């Protein structure tokens, strides 16, 4: 029964659909006139539309003409004319909605029109995909449309250098993955200079597979971390040995459903005996508990060849949803090290957080957000609640005629797979293409062996064979094809009956050495013929496969999420083609075993049928739906929890990152530094004068404290004399006199160094202190969050406590930033060198045609017209980055994975450090507050 909120959402959906139909009709009336334009005239439309928008005309008003232009542009470049429903989907995206469009409806092409329209503003459009392959493929293919229409397109890939990334972001339309966009945001906020910044704002984003990215992956935050101090690695090896002496149920408990472990009293005693300690839970031994829990999890919850594989002595994570190896990715919180110790391979060092953000809060940065997927309505309320995104179900271009058969349920997996193989064999004999979905690499390989025994030629698509995955998927609809895939979510390439003509044409041109960006003219000249030949080759076979019933999708197990089941089914029956789907299940499948074991046991107990006979039961369907509902509910709760806690940190992050960005972009900090000086002096005086009367205040301690900040030029006696005696001294008098003295001292410092030098010194010092203090604050917030759950035992709300203590810690950090900045500005010994001439090399890395349009025609000249003075002060040199950084992000299932990036270039303010020896001239070093 739909809730009231869901009914309201559906009402809004119907109103939006009416508006989209109006837009589609308006675009259709323009189609004939746009077809009469020459290529040059069509490109001129872009300049006209851009000028009209600059003159104040809204993008909504320009939509019909812009979409009509793109429809004609895509017809001429790709040979693809957008259907009315594709235009409706594009309009829904422009209006800031999620367009729910079934698999095969051409979502990649849909994105071109709203991207073009919003690209006219010159602020940049980001098209977000799930992996580098799709980003690159879509950028090359759809980028041809944008370039034909006079826009620029770019692509962000994980291996690119910062200079290349900056160029790609300067384009009108930029493709990339959610993780790369998020990590670039974090990197920008660790930057030491404006030259390191790559992103230029967050204007409009179109998120492909939006449910996967904004829902499934939103449980895990993006984290950039660097090597932590201390040698913890030896403990992983020790505890890997310890857990081999422990027995499940006797020494520890395991909950596979919640993926948690708990150590029992006998187990604790064994661990204490092995380590030679009296109490594992003493405060000094507390860190060891984490090593023990991770070692047990590695032993019981992480299975080789299912969750990870060992290749060349490395533990490589396997994506449980896509079945692909996630090269360079690592589990966080010590879990990867525990698995390495279990497998006796090299254990690599742990890290500490340098920057972090959740996907929810990253995507909330965009002025306008939209998305596409085939399966979004089940999460409509979460999209609205978290992102303020409505879901609009776009009609299919042709009616769906796929037949979804009822599930067949067997008592155990062995007989289930026997039935699966028999079904595949019968379909294969007829020539009908079969797509088989499995939930793990292990099961795909087991099924592959069974098919090989029968001599059935097939392709396996899993973590150990990802290099050819796009070509395998592209041919999965051909006559007689059998494809065994470990989860089809996020594969991207369309399965077309008879073969994928578009993919085949792209492959053919690549074989000829043609590239749409490197050799655009030759590519465009060859495309029409290559695409036509590919279409001819596939059309005849398409008709044969249609006669055979289309693509048969066979699922060997239900996934945890209903959406992923629907995505597998949705591979069949695209664009009105026939198709069929069926799931083969067993009562011992993981989903039933973990989440509805009681129902499974009751069914097995009741049934008197032989093992090899299938059950078709509504009770089974209800049990499966209940199990999937439990998983989805658990994951939704995790996402809510992650967001609640990150919202606390997000307000702090926005304040700090906003300050850093303004500093990097050249804001004058003189006024801010004066406020720092006032606040720091006032805080010191308030601390001294909080209790008692003037005669009893500790002036010696106050003057000692102020002496660490600046060369104080008056004494307590001077102040008393000014007001006629010590009895007349008040807190306000002290503030007035000391602040006046401090500002005179700063004015003298500026006169000595020069205004330009002091402005650059302010920028460098404040940036450095903010970077270091923010990094320390992240560590402390992590530490706070880890232990905050224990507050519930004292009948206190952990979230409220986290908010309260996090605010206190943030205020303490801001005070420390003010105090240390003032101390460094007064006390650092600075040598000023003559500024070098503007570097030609810098300009060489910034192609003028693209960047000048983004930054203004004279941007390059302004940037280099007046070079900043070169300051030589200990600790102010651009800091060294760690030799390697780790980037932790969600995989397709939402679990954390980490990739390592080794670096040799200079680094970021997040890593900056002013050594104690550099913090003084002839004065004591600035006082540092101790923060817990």
Swiss-Prot record:
Basic residues: bias regions: 920-932
Segments for region (Disordered): 857-932
Superkingdom in the source lineage: Bacteria
Record's keyword terms, sorted: ATP-binding, Cell membrane, Cytoplasm, Membrane, Nucleotide-binding, Protein transport, Translocase, Translocation, Transport
One Pfam family named in its UniProt record: SecA_SW
Bias (Polar residues) ranges: 905-915
GO biological process: intracellular protein transmembrane transport; protein import; protein targeting; protein transport by the Sec complex
SUPFAM superfamilies: Helical scaffold and wing domains of SecA, P-loop containing nucleoside triphosphate hydrolases, Pre-protein crosslinking domain of SecA
Coiled coil regions in record: none
Signal peptide interval: none
GO terms assigned for molecular function: ATP binding; protein-exporting ATPase activity
Reaction equation(s) it catalyzes: ATP + H2O + cellular proteinSide 1 = ADP + phosphate + cellular proteinSide 2
EC number annotated for this UniProt entry: 7.4.2.8
Residues the entry annotates as binding ATP: 86, 104-108, 494
SMART domains for the chain: SecA_DEAD, SecA_PP_bind
Subcellular location: Cell membrane; Cytoplasm
HAMAP family: SecA
Function: Part of the Sec protein translocase complex. Interacts with the SecYEG preprotein conducting channel. Has a central role in coupling the hydrolysis of ATP to the transfer of proteins into and across the cell membrane, serving as an ATP-driven molecular motor driving the stepwise translocation of polypeptide chains across the membrane.
Record PANTHER family: CHLOROPLAST PROTEIN-TRANSPORTING ATPASE (PTHR30612:SF0), SECA INNER MEMBRANE COMPONENT OF SEC PROTEIN SECRETION SYSTEM (PTHR30612)
Protein name: Protein translocase subunit SecA
Lineage: Bacteria, Bacillati, Actinomycetota, Actinomycetes, Micrococcales
């Amino acid at each position: 029964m739909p809730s009231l909120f869901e009914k309201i959402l559906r009402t809004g959906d119907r109103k939006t659909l009416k508006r989209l139909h109006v837009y589609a009709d308006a675009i259709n009336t323009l189609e004939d006139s746009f077809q009469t334009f020459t290529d040059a005239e069509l490109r001129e439309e872009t300049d006209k539309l851009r000028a009209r928008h600059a003159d104040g005309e809204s993008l909504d008003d320009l939509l019909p003409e812009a979409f009509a232009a793109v429809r004609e542009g895509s017809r001429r470049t790709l040979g693809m004319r957008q259907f009315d429903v594709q235009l409706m989907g594009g309009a829904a995206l422009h209006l800031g909605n999620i367009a729910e469009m079934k698999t095969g409806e051409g979502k990649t092409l849909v994105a071109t029109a709203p991207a073009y329209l919003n690209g006219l503003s010159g602020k940049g459009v980001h098209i977000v995909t799930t992996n580098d392959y799709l980003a690159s493929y879509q950028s090359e293919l759809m980028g041809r449309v944008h370039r034909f229409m006079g826009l620029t397109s770019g692509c962000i890939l994980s291996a690119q250098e910062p200079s290349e990334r900056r160029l790609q972001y300067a384009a009108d339309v930029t493709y990339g993955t959610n993780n790369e966009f998020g990590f670039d945001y974090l990197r920008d906020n660790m930057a030491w200079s404006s030259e390191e910044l790559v992103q230029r704002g967050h204007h409009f984003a179109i998120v492909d597979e939006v449910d996967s990215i904004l829902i499934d992956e939103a449980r895990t935050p993006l984290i950039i971390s660097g090597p932590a101090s201390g040698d913890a690695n030896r403990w992983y090896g020790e505890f890997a040995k310890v857990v081999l002496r422990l027995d499940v149920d006797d020494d520890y408990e395991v909950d596979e459903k919640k993926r948690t472990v708990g150590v029992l009293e006998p187990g604790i005693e064994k661990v204490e005996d092995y380590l030679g300690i009296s109490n594992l839970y003493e405060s000094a031994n507390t860190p060891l508990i984490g090593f023990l829990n991770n070692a047990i999890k590695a032993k019981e919850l992480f299975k080789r060849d299912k969750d990870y594989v060992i290749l060349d002595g490395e533990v490589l994570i396997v994506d449980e949803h896509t079945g692909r190896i996630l090269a360079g990715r690592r589990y966080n919180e010590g879990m990867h090290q525990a698995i390495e110790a279990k497998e006796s391979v090299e254990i690599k060092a742990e890290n500490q957080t340098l920057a972090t953000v959740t996907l929810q809060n990253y995507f909330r940065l965009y002025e306008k957000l939209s998305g596409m997927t085939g399966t979004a309505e089940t999460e409509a309320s979460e999209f609205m609640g978290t992102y303020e995104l409505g879901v609009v179900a776009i009609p299919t271009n042709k009616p769906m005629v796929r037949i979804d058969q009822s599930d067949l349920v067997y008592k155990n997996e062995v007989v289930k797979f026997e039935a699966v193989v028999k079904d595949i064999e019968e379909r294969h004999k007829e020539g009908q293409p079969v797509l088989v979905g499995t939930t793990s690499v292990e099961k795909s390989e087991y099924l592959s062996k069974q098919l090989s025994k029968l001599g059935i030629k097939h392709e396996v698509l899993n973590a150990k064979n990802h290099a050819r995955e796009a070509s395998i998927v592209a041919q999965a609809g051909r006559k007689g094809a059998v494809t065994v895939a470990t989860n089809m979510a996020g594969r991207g390439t369309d399965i077309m009956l008879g073969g994928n003509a578009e993919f085949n044409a792209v492959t053919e041109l690549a074989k000829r050495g043609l590239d749409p960006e490197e050799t655009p003219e030759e590519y465009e000249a060859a495309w029409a013929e290559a695409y036509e030949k590919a279409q001819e080759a596939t059309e005849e076979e398409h008709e044969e496969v249609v006669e055979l019933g289309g693509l048969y999708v066979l699922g060997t197990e239900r996934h945890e999420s209903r959406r992923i089941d629907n995505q597998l089914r949705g591979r069949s029956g695209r664009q009105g083609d026939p198709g069929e789907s069926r799931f083969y299940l067993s009562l011992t499948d993981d989903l039933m075993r973990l989440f509805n074991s009681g129902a499974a046991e009751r069914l097995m107990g009741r049934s008197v049928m032989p093992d090899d006979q299938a059950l078709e039961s509504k009770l089974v369907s209800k049990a499966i739906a209940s199990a999937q509902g439990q998983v989805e509910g658990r994951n939704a709760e995790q996402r809510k929890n992650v967001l609640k806690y990150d919202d606390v940190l997000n307000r702090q992050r926005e304040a700090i990152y906003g300050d850093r960005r303004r500093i990097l972009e050249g804001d004058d900090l003189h006024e801010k530094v004066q406020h720092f000086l006032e606040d720091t002096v006032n805080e010191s005086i308030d601390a001294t004068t909080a209790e008692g009367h003037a005669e009893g205040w500790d002036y010696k301690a106050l003057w000692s404290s102020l002496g660490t900040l600046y060369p104080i030029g008056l004494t307590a006696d001077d102040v008393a004399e000014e007001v006629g005696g010590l009895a007349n001294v008040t807190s306000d008098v002290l503030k007035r006199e000391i602040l006046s003295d401090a500002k005179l001292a700063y004015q003298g410092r500026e006169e000595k160094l020069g205004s330009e030098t002091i402005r650059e010194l302010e920028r460098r010092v404040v940036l450095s202190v903010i970077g270091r203090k923010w990094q320390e604050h992240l560590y402390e917030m992590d530490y706070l969050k880890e232990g905050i759950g224990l507050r519930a035992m004292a009948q206190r709300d952990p979230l409220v406590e986290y908010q309260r203590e996090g605010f206190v810690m943030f205020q303490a950090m801001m005070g420390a930033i003010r105090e240390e900045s003032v101390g460094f500005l007064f006390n650092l010994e600075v040598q000023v060198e003559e500024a070098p001439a503007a570097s030609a090399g810098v300009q060489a890395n910034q192609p003028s045609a693209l960047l000048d349009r983004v930054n203004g025609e004279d941007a390059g000249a302004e940037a280099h017209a007046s070079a900043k003075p070169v300051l030589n002060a200990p600790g102010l040199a651009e800091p060294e980055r760690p030799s390697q950084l780790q980037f932790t992000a969600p995989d397709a299932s939402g679990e954390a994975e980490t990739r390592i990036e080794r670096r040799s270039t200079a680094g970021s303010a997040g890593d900056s450090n002013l050594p104690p020896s550099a913090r003084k001239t002839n004065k004591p070093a600035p006082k540092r507050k101790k923060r817990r």
